[in-house]
Structures are given as C-alpha cells and as structure tokens.
Amino acid sequence: MAQFDTEYQRLEASYSDSPPGEEDLLVHVAEGSKSPWHHIENLDLFFSRVYNLHQKNGFTCMLIGEIFELMQFLFVVAFTTFLVSCVDYDILFANKMVNHSLHPTEPVKVTLPDAFLPAQVCSARIQENGSLITILVIAGVFWIHRLIKFIYNICCYWEIHSFYLHALRIPMSALPYCTWQEVQARIVQTQKEHQICIHKRELTELDIYHRILRFQNYMVALVNKSLLPLRFRLPGLGEVVFFTRGLKYNFELILFWGPGSLFLNEWSLKAEYKRGGQRLELAQRLSNRILWIGIANFLLCPLILIWQILYAFFSYAEVLKREPGALGARCWSLYGRCYLRHFNELEHELQSRLNRGYKPASKYMNCFLSPLLTLLAKNGAFFAGSILAVLIALTIYDEDVLAVEHVLTTVTLLGVTVTVCRSFIPDQHMVFCPEQLLRVILAHIHYMPDHWQGNAHRSQTRDEFAQLFQYKAVFILEELLSPIVTPLILIFCLRPRALEIIDFFRNFTVEVVGVGDTCSFAQMDVRQHGHPQWLSGGQTEASVYQQAEDGKTELSLMHFAITNPGWQPPRESTAFLGFLKEQVQRDGAAAGLAQGGLLPENALFTSIQSLQSESEPLSLIANVVAGSSCRGPPLSRDLQGSRHRADVASALRSFSPLQPGQAPQGRVPSTMTGSGVDARTASSGSSVWEGQLQSLVLSEYASTEMSLHALYMHQLHKQQTQAEPERHVWHRRESDESGESAPEEGGEGARAPQPIPRSASYPCATPRPGAPETTALHGGFQRRYGGITDPGTVPRAPSHFSRLPLGGWAEDGQPASRHPEPVPEEGSEDELPPQVHKV
C-alpha cells in the first residue's frame, strides 16, 4: 500500500508557474539601477500590507482609523476609572440633598456636575484602590505597546503608500474604487519592472495569494480535517461548537508566530518539524508549550474578562437602546467563516459571499420559529404594548408624568419587551419552503454537509446550521466566556492532539520555489488532495487521510480559477476543469432547452423577478433554484435532482465570453473558459469610472458563475454518493503517543471497523450500508506531473480503511503495519533527509 507518513516535500516548477529553464533563476540587477522595491525580503508582510491598505481605502483612512482605535482604548479605561472613583451616586440617585440656595424652602435643581467629586477627592480615591492601580498600570503598558506598534506601522505603511503611487501608479483618491484584481494585475506587471522577488522572473496570482494567506490556509485545512478541538458534547446541550477570537488568537500564537512556534519566520517551517525522526520529542515540546500558554491565559483571565465586559457594554449598549432587536439578529459565526472559506480566498471575497447568503439564511432560520414561543410572544407583546400605550398617552396629556419615579424606566423596559417579542413573531405572509432556501444558501456559501440535502425541514439540520449562523447574542456571550473557557480548551483538549498536529505540518507542508513553505492543500491539486466523489475519480491518488473533506479542493480550485482567469493551473487541475466543462456541456445539451433562453417561462420565476429588487445574477440563481420545481408533475427525488442538475448545466452553458467594450446585457461572461485575459480589469470607453463600473459588474457575474458551479458540483456529488453509499471520510481519534503500531488483524486488540461519518465537520454516528463502488467519472486519467519519482505511491480505488497511530491507514483484511519502512523516532535526523520532489 502507499506510504502516507510522507516527509516534507519541495515542489518546484509545477506550482511556481515559472517559465521553462527559470525555476532556479536568481535575477541580478546592477547596483545603480535598483529600485526601492527591488528584492523585498519579507514578501509575506509586504503583500499583506498592500492588501490591508487597499481594504482600508487608502493611507489617510487607515491612519485615522488607527488613531481612533488608540483613543477608543484610552477612553474605555479613563471613562471606567471616572465612573468608579469620581462620581457621587448618592447625589445622582437623589439619596442626598444638595442646596445651592440661601433659602432652604426654595426648590432646588440638581445638575450633573453636582454628582462629580472634586479632583482632589477623586485622586485620593484612586490612590487608595490598589486593584484599580494595578489594572491601570497594566492598561498603560498595553497602550504604550500599541502606541509604539502604531508608530512603526505608520512608517511601514508610508512605504506601501509610496509603492502605490510610484510603482503601481494608483493615487490614493482612486484606491477605494479599484478592485483587488486590478491592484493584483499591476503587482504582477510591476514584478517585471522592479523585480520585487528575485527568485522568479514573473509572479502569478497564486504566488500573491499564498504569501497573504499562508497561515490562513493552514487554519482552513486544520478545521477541514477536524484537528482543532472545536466541537464539544455538553450535558443538556448536546453537541456545541466553541470558536472565539480569543481561542483563534491562541491557536495562531502557538502554531505560527508566537515565541517557540513551529515556524522559523513568516515563510519557513523549522527544519526539525520537516523530519519524522523526532516527532514524539517535538510533540512533547509542543504539549508543554500549550500547557504554559494555557496557564498564562488562566492567570490573565480576570483582566481579559473585565476588558471583554467593558468593551461589549460600551460597544452594544447604544445599539441595544437604538435597536433592541439587534441581539435577536444573526451573524456568521467564526467557525462558520473558517468552515465555509475556500483555500486561497481573501477576506473580502469571503465576506462578499457571506453577505449574499445572509438574507436567505435569515429567512431559512425564521422558518423554524416555535409555535409555542410565537404564541407567548404575541400575548407578551399585547400586554406590554397595552401598558406602554397608556403611559405614552398620559405623557402626551401631561409631561409631568415623566417626573414620577420609575416611569421613564418602565416605558423603556416595556418598549424593549415589545421589540423583543415582535422578533419572535413570524411574518404572516411567509411561505414555508426550507428546501429552496437551503439551495439558495448553498449557491452562495458553497459548502454544506451531505445529510442536509433533502432534510432542510428537520430540526437537526436547523441546529447544525445554527452553528454556522448564530444569534448575535450568542456570539457576544461566547466572547465574554472566552477568557474562562480558552485555558481549559488549551490545557485539556488541544494538548492531547499535539502529536497529530506535528504529523499534520510535516505531511501537509511543501516548499514552493519563490514562495516558501505552504500548506499542500493550498496548491488545490486534485491529484494530491482530490476526493473521488467530487468529480476527481480517476484523477486523484490521494488516500482517505490526504483527501480534503466536503469537496474543499475541487470547489477551491473552481473558485480560484473563476476569480483569477489569467492564472494557468497545473496540468491535472486543467484537466479537471476541462472535464467539468465537458460534463456541463453534456448535461446542458441533454436538458433539451432552447439556446435563446435560460429556462422556459413559468409563473413562479416571473413573480420572483417582478417582486425582487435583486441584481440580474441573483435573479438568475433564483430562476435556477425555482425552475425545476415549477415544471411538470411532481417527480421522485432522484428525477428532481437530475432535472435540477440539467437546469444548472443549461444556465452555465448560456454563459458567453464578454468582449472588451461590450456592455453586459442579459448574458453572463465566461471567466473560466475565456482567453485567459481578465476581462474584469479591462476598461471600456475613455472614462475611468466606466471601467471601474464594468469591473464591478463583471465581478458580480463571476460570483454568479461560481454559485452555479457550486450547485452543479453538489448535485453531481449527491448523485455519485447515492450510487456509492459508503463515503470514505477521514475522522481523527486521539493520538497514540506511544508510537506503537496498530494491532494485527485477528489479534487480541483487533477492533471492528468504526462507522464512517458522512461529514468530517458534521459527524453522524449512523453508518451507511455498503454498496459496490462506481467507476471513475473520467476513467483512464492517470497522468501525473512529469518527472516525479515516487514509487511508494500507487493509485488504487478507495476501500475500507482502519486507522493507524501515525494518521496513516491500512486496508481491512491486511496487517495494519504503520510504515512499509519504519521511521526511527530518535537520533535519525541525519539519516532522514527531506524527500525532494523534482518537477
């Protein structure tokens, strides 16, 4: 069988996209002709700052935003200290009388300054409070640290400001109206003039994405392979997901950039983590480091908790007063953002997708309001509203009613109660259609567990989707609990997985020429990490351990190819995209639809287009989703799936390339199958504004094309899964740190095969019945990168596997040996050089 405990790999030209003969090129430029941006050493940080400056709309906006962040921190600390030590609450609450008049019988008005203590008294109370002094000292040190960091960042971003002006020739006034694709295209062109990277003559879009998203790609892969402890089963609550900003910060601190982390710098993994000889020692070292960071979090817990409470209060108090139903609104959870993120997807691209899916996601969750809760909310709103109406009427009649004690408080609380109750009352005109809503959501978020399809009306699906799309109040509560829960997760949940994390970084890290060490999943190579049930059958050599779950490799490749049409993918990826295009053409032709229109006219689609104020691409998605349910008599689920697949394929076939200067009218431009020129960066006419407008419109059509491809690929995957019910999904178990091999079959320690869950991110304990495996979609496709010599890798059909201690797999019915050749665990660093893969 194949050897899955691979060593660190160095990949060259196939991923660097360098011209032939320039793989190891080192460009030399005469000293006098060097530009200020020649040979930038830390390109990761440089490209990240270029991207951040673009997202923050220029240097001035970024500078003012940073200044306000410093002032905001200073205000929170100073204002809290003032409220604690400098206010006489007895006067404020009228428990103590203040008389400014010489005649005691005269009425007295208490002003706000009367409740403020004198400066001397305030200072004395602060000095007497030792706990407050300690907190102020720590806050002052932290603020000075942020101030120094702010000054340093301003100096660095001024250099980026000059880079935009002189190298990219983009003025700051025009930067907010330039898309990232336009900036990226100019960076690629600037490389030819200034040689930003001396290891390559030309930069590609993938090189830039790799440097900006190096650590983010690792995080997406860790979540995809379920290696981070994010799911917990609690008594009375069932399975919950806990992933907060504080926990994510600690993960990144431990793994990527903190002292003693796995990385030597931003672009290079430490040499000892690239070899398998010291894996147990490295795992123990990582475990100890996690323990100490967990203890540090525990000691700092009171301070962090106080800051979280104060920041949440000052941030959301005004919002809650102005819009009491805001906490009843929903937002995408941090886990959802990581689970739904493609490999090599920038933050603004992810945010754009999630924003498009917000409305249908909200409508879907509103379909599941409890009838009992709705009944209670209606009656609660009636009683609270009645009392509120009487108080408001009395106030209108005589405003002195507000002077009565607690009247204003009662009015405020009753108003909040009415608003909260209304948020639990559904719209009386709403139609319950969860399946169509879930399909629209899938068109935008692109990822969804298999067992959700066809079960959108079930409460289990709703509860699992709520882990991705949670209440804003739940998000705030998790952030408040994070300082308490994070140390427990680090010490008791993350430490036992130290060995698996060490193996993950060794097995899934490759060195790309001109880029450095990157996550191998970020290469989007269907041969290395494709899944046979996601159109990669016959094209992938990946084991179950190496496969990305939920079609992450295939969908990420499609997304990147559509977003960056000028990018030239490797040979296997090109073959995959070509095969998908052929499949779309076949299914679209089989649909028997007219070439002039996307779908036949139907009443539901006409009403959707007449009632919606959406853009044309979103109306197209609504057309595709609604089309298959509006034509003909009711069909079985399989026939409905085939019809839906044909509808999507027909919509994709209708896409035609948009020529420069042609306005998009009724046609969607093809960005994946075009000539390789990014039409979104082309300007039509002499006006810059026209070019920018066309760029935005074409970007919208590109996102629509990706949405249709996501629907189409999920439908193909569903049909293939039904033909082959047993899906082979890698799911982790606790590491065997002893390093012993798995028991032989028939031995005392032999175990029955564990049930395979349907989704690594949403595990299900119910196993599927076995079935014969289907043939490959693209049989006979066994091409590999020329020049790769890996005799240990043998392509074979998927079969049942049992887990090995190192994360490898053995076929059922065979002895479960851990390695074809045992890897020594100590003292073998010199005998185990990294395996170099030449391309």
From Swiss-Prot:
GO terms for biological process: autophagosome assembly; autophagy; bone morphogenesis; innate immune response; mitophagy; negative regulation of interferon-beta production; negative regulation of macrophage cytokine production; piecemeal microautophagy of the nucleus. Glycans are attached at residue 99. Ufmylated in a DDRGK1 dependent manner. One of its GO terms (cellular component) is autophagosome. Residues 737-747, 823-832 have a biased composition (Acidic residues). It comes from the Eukaryota. It is found in: Preautophagosomal structure membrane; Cytoplasmic vesicle, Autophagosome membrane; Golgi apparatus, trans-Golgi network membrane; Late endosome membrane. GO terms for molecular function: phospholipid scramblase activity. It is a multi-pass membrane protein. Residues 724-736 have a biased composition (Basic and acidic residues). Belongs to the ATG9 family. Homotrimer; forms a homotrimer with a central pore that forms a path between the two membrane leaflets. Interacts (via cytoplasmic its C-terminus) with ATG2A. Interacts with SUPT20H. Interacts (via the tyrosine-based sorting signal motif) with AP4M1; promoting association with the AP-4 complex. Interacts with ARFIP1 and ARFIP2. Interacts with PI4K2A and PI4KB. Interacts with ATG4A; the interaction is direct and promotes ATG9A trafficking. Forms a homotrimer with a solvated central pore, which is connected laterally to the cytosol through the cavity within each protomer. Acts as a lipid scramblase that uses its central pore to function: the central pore opens laterally to accommodate lipid headgroups, thereby enabling lipid flipping and redistribution of lipids added to the outer leaflet of ATG9A-containing vesicles, thereby enabling growth into autophagosomes. The tyrosine-based sorting signal motif, also named YXX-psi motif, promotes interaction with the AP-4 complex. This is Autophagy-related protein 9A. The gene is Atg9a.
